Each structure stands twice: as structure tokens, then as C-alpha cells.
């Protein structure tokens, strides 16, 4: 894709150079504004991708190993790990192939490179869509477990969870294929941006509602213990901080990428928007960082999963 769209690293992009250290660069055209461009070294990009791969492989292995983790909640977490794993693997693969082509170690015709790039882009886009979907699915699952605790196991059954998981993967593959095929069409870009906004709003509404319920529960306990003010205030600050971190990381890691897509629709030729387009590889790096952070937010907080993870790591040595 061009510099105004999601860049195809194999075919060249404004950031497709090979710096050895990250740096900030001010670039200016004769008729345009001075732009702050953040160059991401290929070594750093590959290293972050490999860290994400290792983390998410361990999460998937731990869930597969421990039968106590074979429940809808952990299946959603496992699928999120698979999605993040695919995000990292496909980006690392694309960067590695790009470096081989640039170094002359991989000789291929332009048509072959184009086809390979299309396949990798479909995988990247599909894994991103599925990752967002499973973040939303985890939020819905947690919401149901709190507000429908007595009926939760009859509502969220394994067959229903597997149907939801299958639907998410199918929808992700189809939507990513359409996106890569018609990425220049405004309607496709608007659909992707709208999808991100919908996921952000869904997660914000559900988690804020869950926080309100938890604070209400804490007030009830505080009344019984006659320490209402201190307990309620402490819990409120802790809950608000957790919610801010969860939604803040989601927005900071995914927001720039979808801002990029929004500007492709709103101002594809504007010089200031062009400054944003030049940092597309930085936005991809933020998504890789999100894949690294997700296991700490959703998986590693589980004591059962951490225990199984230790067993997996010890068995591998």
C-alpha cells in the first residue's frame, strides 16, 4: 500500500529503511510543513515481535496443558493470545522477508513479492480484527460473570463459546480479505474505523458498569464493617486506576493505527496528514507492544495460569 495507506513494507515505504538506532527526524517538503518522523529500527521491531511470540505461545501452551483452564473465559484469553501471536508472527515475517529482499539474499519477481505481500497483509489485518474481537468478547464474558453470576454457566456454555470463537475467526478472515482487496475504498476504511470505535465504546461501557457494581458491593461490605469511607475510597481509587490502565493501553496502542485510517478518508492529500502517514511503522510497533502487554493484563493475573506457566517453562528446560 502507498504511504497514504497501510504501507506494504515489502514494496517499500517511507519508513522501510534499516536504521540501527531509533531516532526522531524532522522532514519538510518545500511546500509542506516540517514533520516529526519516528524511525523504528528493524532490529527493535523484530525483537519486540519475538518477545510477543514467546509470551503468547506460553499462554496458549499453559491453557492447553491445564484442564482446569478449559473454560469459556480461558478459551477467549487463549484465542486473544493466538491473535496477538499472529499479529507478531506476520509482522516479523514481513520484516524478515523485506530485509532478505533488500539484501539480495532472496531473489523474487515483483509479481511473486506482490502476492506474498498480499497474503501477509491479509494475515496481519485478520489477526488485528480478531484481536479486537476477542478483547470485546473477554469484556462481555466478564460482564456476564458479574451481573448474571447465578446464570453465567447456563448462559456462557462451551458450545456457545466455540460458536462465538468460530464466528470471530471467520469474520476476521473475510473482513481482512475485503480490506486488502478494497483498501482504497472509503467505505471499507470507514467500516474498520467504526469497528474500532465500537469496540472501544463497548469495552468502556462494560468495564465502567462493572466498576460501578464493584464499588457498590464494596460500600455494602464497608457498612457491615463500619469503615465505609476508608474502604470505599481505597477501592474506588484502585478500581479507577485499573480501568484507566486497561482502557488507556487499548486506546494508546490501537488508536494511532485507526487515526491513520481515518485520515486516509478525511485528508489523504493534506500535508499535515502526510506527516501522520510517515509514522505508520511506529503505529504497527505500538500494536506489537499491545500484544506484549495483553498477557500481563488478561492472562498472567490468574494464579492457576501462572502456576501452569511455571510448569511449562520448567518442562521446556
Swiss-Prot record:
Its main location: membrane. Glycans are attached at residue 29. It is found in: Cell membrane. SUPFAM superfamilies: Family A G protein-coupled receptor-like (SSF81321). It comes from the Eukaryota. The chain crosses the membrane at residues 38-63, 73-93, 119-140, 164-183, 192-211, 241-266, 280-300. Pfam families: 7tm_1 (PF00001). Receptor for MSH (alpha, beta and gamma) and ACTH. The activity of this receptor is mediated by G proteins which activate adenylate cyclase. Mediates melanogenesis, the production of eumelanin (black/brown) and phaeomelanin (red/yellow), via regulation of cAMP signaling in melanocytes. Belongs to the G-protein coupled receptor 1 family. PANTHER family: G-PROTEIN COUPLED RECEPTOR (PTHR22750). This is Melanocyte-stimulating hormone receptor. It comes from Vulpes vulpes (Red fox). The lineage of its organism: Eukaryota, Metazoa, Chordata, Craniata, Vertebrata. The gene is MC1R.
